[in-house]
Amino acid sequence: MFEAIIYNISVMVAGIYLFHRLQYSENKRMIFSKEYVTVLMTFVSLLLAAYPIPFQNEYLVHLTFVPLLFLGRYTNMIYTLTAAFIVSLVDVFIFGNSIIYGITLIVIAGIVSAVGPFLKQNDIISLLILNLISIIILLFLALLSPIYELVEILVLIPISFIITIASAITFVDIWHFFSLVNRYENEDKYDYLTGLGNVKEFDRHLNEVSSKAEEKKQSLALLLIDIDGFKDVNDHYSHQSGDAVLKQMSQLLKNYVPNQFKIFRNGGEEFSVVIRDYTLDQSVKLAENIRSGVEKSSFHLPNKEVIKLSVSIGVGYLTQEDRKSQRKVFKDADDMVHVAKSEGRNKVMFNPIVKL
């Protein structure tokens, strides 16, 4: 029995490490993938099904439901039920387990996936709550069906909680470790708070786009976006609230900026968008859409308060005929931001170019 318990815990811990390691090896960035974790936890669940824990040479304790708790917490109902269905089929038709237990596994998957994403507790507590829900379902099964004895559930309770705690701690710790490694390896390119390109990457990208625009005789535009009154958010609420605003702002910008253009956080409360081969009207319209979108949006703070914000946007623009000067387009955009601020904020300002 002891060997089987160690095996089950080892399979879970090794599987969790493998998930993080494979994902990091593939893209060098820690981006949570529902597909990755579903494939992994399905495989781990099958390994646990192949090696149940014997007790008194009479009972077998199955822990195949534990990996499904992670799917219920971190993915959604479709992924969790798909994994449960696959595991149930293999468990019944290959490992010879009862079809009633297979159905119970699917019921557990459905319930934990409906509850898991909405739990407000931290990850470890949330997984323990899902484990408790699963135990209650299995207890109900033991009372109604002769195929599962009450003594098996009593043995299952401490073992399942131990493996859930060990797996949850491993999952969270390894995630934090690889996230720190990812942050260290990408700090020259990415802003760790928002995930956008940082000011170094902005300079490199603007230089690259300027060269391409010059070579292909295309226009070049730059939007500098500054959050109005951001210092007041930090001072009145907290720096944690300011960080929350920056994260939400970066997501809002992603919703408005076309995929072919890159967004950067230049530092503090300033963001930028580099645009190539757009007319001045198109560039100004994009800036106005962003300004209007921010004005209509609500920003949620960690203390549950909701605030409204605005942005001032400066547009720098070089026509197809202009020499593509990285310094000039930045200066024009920066000057226009200051004009927008002086004109009362919450404005888009640009310097119209008229050639006679």
From Swiss-Prot:
Gene3D superfamilies in UniProt: 3.30.70.270
Subcellular location: Cell membrane
Residue ranges occupied by any GGDEF domain in the UniProt entry: 218-353
PROSITE patterns (UniProt xref): GGDEF
Topological relation to the membrane, as annotated: Multi-pass membrane protein
GO molecular function, one term: phosphorelay sensor kinase activity
Segments passing through the bilayer: 2-22, 35-55, 76-96, 99-119, 124-144, 151-171
Signal sequence segment: none
One GO term describing the cellular component: plasma membrane
Keywords for this protein: Cell membrane, Membrane, Transmembrane, Transmembrane helix
UniProt-listed GO biological process terms: cell adhesion involved in single-species biofilm formation; cell wall organization; negative regulation of bacterial-type flagellum-dependent cell motility
Pfam families, A to Z: 5TM-5TMR_LYT, GGDEF
Protein name, as recorded: Uncharacterized membrane protein SERP0413
